[in-house]
Amino acid sequence: MDKNKDLLENEQFLRIQKLNASDAGKRQSILVDNEDELYGLTSSNNSCASEHEGEGEGEDERPATTSSAPTQNHSAGDVAFIPGKTAEEDTETVTKVVESDDQVFRTHVQTLSSKGKSRYRKGSSNFISFFDDMAFENRPSILDGSVNDPFKTKFVGPTLEKEIRKREKELMAMRKNLHHGKPAPDADAADAPALTTTTTTTTSATSPETVVTIETTILSSNFSGLYVAFWMAIAFGAVKALIDYYYQHNGSFKDSEILKFMTTNLSTVALIDLIMYLSTFFVVGIQYLCKWGVLNWSSTGWAFTSIYELLFVGFYMYLTENILKLHWLSKIFLFLHSLVLLMKMHSFAFYNGYLWGIKQELQFSKSALAKYKDSVNDPDVVDALEKSCEFCSFELNSQSLNDQTQKFPNNINVSNFFMFTMFPTLIYQIEYPRTKEIRWVYVLEKICAIFGTIFLMMIDAQILMHPVAMRALDVRNSEWTGILDRLLKWAGLLVDIVPGFIVMYILDFYLIWDAILNCVAELTRFGDRYFYGDWWNCVSWADFSRIWNIPVHKFLLRHVYHSSMSSFKLNKSQATLMTFFLSSVVHELAMYVIFKRLRFYLFFFQMLQVPLVALTNTKYMKDRTVIGNVIFWLGICMGPSVMCTLYLTF
């Protein structure tokens, strides 16, 4: 009976019982930094908690969180009370400590008690992993799956004329039979893959009572030839522009400003980029210290990691601007790459931080269950411990299904983090879908696409954009003659730069999200090539923000959207606003790196997407998808040009 009382009055067990209550439906997580003092328990040296992750990961829309039950013992995970005291005295001591620290306890409860996650799907006993918000699988990119691969494997030339002639013969035979009152032969639609038919009904001329079905053919064709013609036109246009520039500048390219930008300080940029990459392994060191029991993730590990992440971006911004004084092109490259590395560090660190909490709770639940299972009469107590063990075991085991040697915490090693940094993804997990081999011909195609696209971008920037940018700087540095005059000049610059920016936007997207990411994915045998969706068909900015950049969207979904719901008790709308706000701040920082001017134009346009999303969800716009797509493309064509000229002119 004393053991029953010990367990039922143990604060740690009461937390786990609440987390796993079948009628509660949510798994609450409460952290107090000085839990050891509050509960009068000592923490195991070989475990780290993970309460600060709070990342939502699940298809459920409720906020997600980490939750852990610290291992309260000196050895083997057994529950240990204050030495030299009976169970009754120990309970009284815990009560007094809690009462004396009541204000601290309440503060932590108010901050963290909202962190919760449903462990079971509604109406079933199936677990919901904290990482159910996304899944990786073997799949090609959209351009490869819809255009490139079919063109290379299925293109046979013109087929429409052959199918039309076949259908014409069938139609003439059908009409002839109808004229003589004979039944129409069945047309095999499968024999006409290039044609789509609609069905109408008529009556026989000789037998009005007979209803006859006639199929009307709608033409459809393969446009692969136009795909070839498009790139052919781009290539000839680029060659012509290159030749014209060559002769206009006395047979030399040395005067090209864009070429100078691209080739200045290459060795310095490469060295800084290497140092920046190597410095990301700091988070691996933090996880090693947690693994060895030197640091506790919940109290110090997460704090060291978060501070380092802020210093990481700030330091390299300061280094490139104030010390090295690099050109704007070098600065924006290093800044954007630092953001990529920052997101990778954060995902690796807080993924493992969450699993430290799960592992700790499993240790506590197993030890408590082994000690009290036969002596506790309350079935709810045993049920809570068993559910905790089941869920934590499921969560840990489901992270590494194919390679047990990388099972947490064995995944915390330099080689594992190195491979993650090589993969074209910002979301860390222990295993990813992989292809069987590297297609070196495919790699060569993508390398050619990379350098070819960069070549086109340089020509576009040199001929269509750079002259307009220089005129914009002249306008900014000219004598102020009034806002109206400045706006008129700005409007003229805007009209001139729009065509070049449209081309640059499309080429930039293709270069990064298709050519580079697919090349890296092939070299690392990374199977999931879903780097972007069909954003060109978007009818709202909400769709665009989700599918134009899938890797970043996944990161924001897990580490910002769900995390803000858990940590700051935000609802879905507030979490969405929070995500847009953070994204807008980062985009504005990018503009500061380029223009060295803090004007908040891009921040304003980014946040403007929020009311635009609400507008597209209205009854008037929801069913007008064509208008929505036209408005979307108007924004894509005008938006970058408007922002660039605003930063340059004002």
From Swiss-Prot:
Any GO BP: ergosterol metabolic process
Region (Disordered): 41-79
Enzyme Commission code(s) on record: 2.3.1.-
Gene behind the chain: ARE2
Pfam families: MBOAT
Family: Belongs to the membrane-bound acyltransferase family. Sterol o-acyltransferase subfamily.
Tagged with keyword Acyltransferase: yes
GO molecular function: ergosterol O-acyltransferase activity
Compartment list: Endoplasmic reticulum membrane
Sequence motif FYXDWWN motif, residues: 531-537
Originating organism: Saccharomyces uvarum (strain ATCC 76518 / CBS 7001 / CLIB 283 / NBRC 10550 / MCYC 623 / NCYC 2669 / NRRL Y-11845) (Yeast)
GO cellular component: endoplasmic reticulum membrane
Chief location category: endoplasmic reticulum
Membrane topology type: Multi-pass membrane protein
Compositionally skewed regions (Polar residues) per UniProt: 64-75
Record keywords, A-Z: Acyltransferase, Endoplasmic reticulum, Membrane, Transferase, Transmembrane, Transmembrane helix
Name of the protein in its database record: Sterol O-acyltransferase 2
Record function comment: Sterol O-acyltransferase that catalyzes the formation of stery esters.
